[in-house]
Amino acid sequence: MLFPLWTSLLVRSYAWMVLLQRTGIVNQVLGDLGLIAAPLPLVYNELGVVIGMTHVLLPFAVLPIYAGMRQVDPALLRAGHFFRVFLPLTAPGVAAGALLVFVLAMGYFVIPALLGGRGAITIAMLIERQITMLLNWGFGSALSVLLIASVLLVLGLATWLAGVRLPEVGGRSRPVATGGQVEDADEKPLDGTRWQGGARLEQPVAAPMLRRRPGRARRRWLRCAAGPAWLGIAAGAVYVFLLAPIALVVAMSFSSSQYLRFPPPGLSLQWFRAYFGSAEWIDATLLSLEIAVVTMIAGTVLGTLGAIGLVRVRHWSTRALYGVLLSPMIAPQIITATACYALFVKLRLVGSVVAIAAAHTVLATPFVIVTVSSALAQVDERLEWAARGLGMGPLRAFVSITAPLIMPAIASGAVFAFITSFDEVVIALFLTGTAHPTLPRKMWDAVAMQLDPTLAAVSTIMVAMSVLVLLIGQASRVWFDRYHTAARSDAV
């Protein structure tokens, strides 16, 4: 379900362009089935934008919804009505997922620009056009302020009117009052004797629903028997929707045809040879790798230090500072790109590795903060106090005790930072030129001019690199876990 999050946004956009074009697979299938007489206009309009953005943002909705469902006792689903019991308990997660998707969609640039074109112009596209093409900084800045104000207004209204907030991250538990005591809402799942928010019930929620008449019990049994089948079909459809476009692009990268065609008439490596034989593609790839490594190092260091300060410093302003540090994750990326472009134009650094890496670090650092702070909040600080009581200094105690415990989270944050930089295209459009583009910028220019099959090979390589980085990150986590397990065994 989350694999598309690790796949390049340009790869997914390119996949939908191939699928939805007039000679694409969707129109071919519909025509072969006799459902349409002429190709449907599925791309370069609002429909194409909706399909592409749904594909991209669906995993962001799944995360908070899944987290909310995990807190509900499965016995409630078996014994109670879905709409009366399960849905009300998971409603906060559903609302948070919807709010997150809405906020992210407000400032999206890549999908509308590629799949919408002139048929679906968004405010993010207007900002990019005013600043990079028309050089109208005043109007472009005004649109940027209007966009960020709209995002803040939506967040404020959702919190004030409905109590809906974006998913909380950072690993901090939310206390819940029950019966005059404070319990940790993250420690105990909702069960049959507890309602969300901590209110105790006189009897389990499931109890009255178990005492049913035989006729109603039989109908209930039939619905339960049919439920898993429909759920399986729905889940399968979602997986196909998320993974099929990527799989089709990978398949077409091995095609022997001279143009995009599915199914491929034969297998060939010609498009991979074209990629590796092109100095422009190789230079763009090496430049992206260089920037991604610099971003990973800088983002990991800054994000880890920020997480330590947020978790360990007890002050009333910590929560507000946490929101400020995470703002690049929520703010429309076109706003960040515009601000970075305005800064580096004055510093005369546009086009340099330093400028691009610095801008990417702004985007990558919040991911490291989220990952490391979640792990650091679970570490018992008394372990460091004990070490300091035995004569260790504060720095040595942290490095010897806490740092090894959060090292897997730091490694995961580094992976996030690397992939965030390697896949980034919006800032690259502002800070790089056509002479020395990054790989995403090179792909953007190629997609804008023509759907060259070489792009399918490049997309496959980017997917493979993302999978490789994920495997390296997972292997490092396993190694750290085994290392510390062995160290504890030796100590005992």
Labelled PLM ranges:
Residues 221-227:
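A detector for short, charged/polar N-terminal pre-domain segments
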Residues 27-28, 119-130, 263-277, 434-448:
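Short hydrophobic, aromatic-rich alpha-helical segments embedded in or entering the lipid bilayer
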Residues 116, 120, 265, 354, ...:
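Short, conserved glycine- and acidic-residue-centered signature motifs
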Residues 125, 129, 252, 287, ...:
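Conserved adenine-binding aromatic site and its adjacent loop/helix in ATP-hydrolyzing domains
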